[in-house]
Amino acid sequence: MLESKKEALLSELVAQLCAERNFAFPQVQGFDELWQHFRALVNTREPAPISPFWLEKQDELLSGLLAEGGISSLDDAAVSPLNPRIRLWQGDITRLAVDGIVNAANSQMLGCWQPGHFCIDNAIHTFAGVQLRLECAQLMQAQGHEEPTGHAKITGGYNL
């Protein structure tokens, strides 16, 4: 994806995220600064629906970024010395072309709320898209209590 296309998409996305919170659009230049603001805004966005138009732009951006960064397959993961049916991966979990990943999430299942924090929760929630936090919130509301340690939920992967 061309740098100009990424910047245009990010500008649209950041503008909408700022507007929904009554924030002024940040005085930023270039992809890197826009990306930092985008990450901070989505990392701290409450789980809520957003327009299909915004989701389309977000999905276009995220799928393009993931493709640019390179996707790793199961064959790139090491076979466990204890069980040949288990593969071990060390690296960016958002770059795996697999059917599922496991996140040691917090008991609210809503990810990290620290803007721009480089943790696995933020990586997964950023690259999956804002749909993931909304789905997790809906699952937790239906469940009516926090997720116990050692339990799991299956969600959509969205852009992952």
Put a short name on every predicted segment.
Residues 1-160:
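Macrodomain-like recognition of ADP-ribose-binding/processing modules
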